[in-house]
From Swiss-Prot:
Cyclin N-terminal domain residues: 27-152
Bias-annotated ranges (Low complexity): 271-286
Sequence segments annotated as region (Disordered): 257-293
Subunit structure and binding partners: Interacts with the CDK4 and CDK6 protein kinases to form a serine/threonine kinase holoenzyme complex. The cyclin subunit imparts substrate specificity to the complex. Interacts with ATF5. Interacts with EIF3K. Component of the ternary complex cyclin D/CDK4/CDKN1B required for nuclear translocation and modulation of CDK4-mediated kinase activity. Can form similar complexes with either CDKN1A or CDKN2A.
Gene giving rise to this polypeptide: Ccnd3
Domain of life: Eukaryota
Keyword Signal: no
Modified residues (Phosphoserine): 265, 280
Any single biological process term in GO: hyaluronan biosynthetic process
SMART domains: CYCLIN, Cyclin_C
A GO term, aspect molecular function: cyclin-dependent protein serine/threonine kinase regulator activity
Name listed for the protein in its UniProt record: G1/S-specific cyclin-D3
Gene3D superfamilies, per the entry: Cyclin-like (1.10.472.10)
Family the entry assigns: Belongs to the cyclin family. Cyclin D subfamily.
Annotated organism of origin: Rattus norvegicus (Rat)
Length: 293
């Protein structure tokens, strides 16, 4: 006897892309005007933090990314949480024993802003192996909000993706794949402190350029594509080329090398071994091993 399951995954209602908004130059200019407000000023490892080092931030970032993947969060939750983390660390000296607590609170805040069903404090405590209590997260949530002046609607690189892709006019059968690859680049950039002080528009533009060239999604040469992308966001061509070739693609090669040497470490599961939210309509970004250089 054969069994046939016709039950589909329940999807949350979503509005489709609005061509008028995507094509309105005022939307893009508004984001470009606001983005500098949310970029850390200078390296906080040199002038603010005494105990925390860059490799500690990277370890925390990988853990936060794994939690987001396990919970099938929206693609922009993780980079937004890293933006909160960098902005807090750029102005408040923090002990290394408090770093995971800070990262957990940043995940909580980002999910509240960008998720339909945000992560719960209890679930986040499970992911820390009960290393922190719910009351600590609640206290630090208020603390982080105060230090960020309650300004949580930060402009991040993800906000530019749809606007830039709309202006590229790529073949319709390649747009989704290019976007997915670009999202992977953005997640990778968020784990690397090198990109913390880059304008989000430059990171988004460089990520799309790397994705388009890697997939061969258009007939333009590398120089022509770079000039077109630079014109869309008003970025200098040389700066964009350096960001794409010397930083983003180099970071990807390093990540691929690390992935080949070490197996991914599992994160603690929610009760029952799976997300209590059930299947989600959002998917995690394409794995770095699926990227074509």
């Amino acid at each position: 006897m054969e069994l046939l399951c016709c039950e589909g995954t329940r999807l949350a209602p979503r509005a489709g892309p609005d061509p008028r908004l995507l094509g309105d130059q005022r939307v893009l200019q508004s984001l470009l005007r606001l983005e500098e407000r949310y970029v850390p000023r200078g390296s906080y490892f040199q002038c603010v933090q005494k105990e925390i080092k860059p490799h500690m931030r990277k370890m925390l970032a990988y853990w936060m990314l794994e939690v987001c993947e396990e919970q099938r969060c929206e693609e922009d939750v993780f980079p937004l949480a890293m933006n909160y983390l960098d902005r807090y660390l750029s102005c408040v000296p923090t002990r290394k024993a408090q770093l995971q607590l800070l990262g957990t609170v940043c995940l909580l805040l980002a999910s509240k802003l960008r998720e339909t069903t945000p992560l719960t404090i209890e679930k986040l405590c499970i992911y820390t192996d009960q290393a922190m209590a719910p009351w600590q997260l609640r206290e630090w949530e208020v603390l982080v909000l105060g230090k960020l002046k309650w300004d949580l609607a930060a402009v991040i690189a993800h906000d530019f993706l749809a606007l830039i892709l709309h202006r590229l006019s790529l073949p319709s059968d390649r747009q989704a794949l290019v976007k997915k690859h670009a999202q992977t680049f953005l997640a990778l950039c968020a784990t690397d402190y090198t990109f913390a002080m880059y304008p989000p528009s430059m990171i988004a533009t460089g990520s799309i350029g790397a994705a388009v060239l890697g997939l061969g999604a258009c007939s333009m040469s590398a120089d022509e594509l770079t000039e077109l992308l630079a014109g869309i966001t008003g970025t200098e061509v040389d700066c964009l080329r350096a960001c794409q070739e010397q930083q983003i693609e180099a970071a990807l090669r390093e990540s691929l090398r690390e992935a080949a040497q070490t197996a991914p470490s599992p994160v603690p599961k929610a009760p029952g071994g799976s997300s209590s939210q059930g299947p989600s309509q959002t998917s995690t970004p394409t794995d770095v091993t699926a990227i074509h250089l």
